[in-house]
Amino acid sequence: MTLAKALGSGAPLGAFLTKEFCSVLEPGDHGSTFGGNALTTAAGAAAAKVIVDEDIPELANETGAYFQGKLNGLSEKYEFITEVRGMGLLIALQMNIDIAGAAVTAALPEGLLINAVRPNMIRFMPPLNVTRDEIDEAVAILDKVLEETSK
């Protein structure tokens, strides 16, 4: 498995993970431009410590459940919302009408960044430290946007 991007919390850090029985690389077999950098390794260790100490996975699950609950509330208002699904804070809202692109365009000037992954599907990927107040604000904007774009 390869890991990168958030691993160093903004510092250029990547990792390659494998089971011990897959270990075939010997020292000197592989090199990279960012290999062995003490600063980025320290950043990665600090990021991992925060993830464990603050139980970020559980926080993401709890906050994601709250977000999905709010989106399910919108599905009661708008019959064209057919499904809300996700894991943690990676959430999708599926519709039976193709307004995702228009919703993205309408949401941006309101301060909400969302992604149309299909013509009928919006993806939400907020930061792991998103607050319930920010989720409430996002859902209020989305409510307004869906009302406008579904006419």
Features from the language model and the residues they span:
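Conserved N-terminal phosphate-binding loop of PLP-dependent enzymes in the Aspartate aminotransferase
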Residues: 1-151
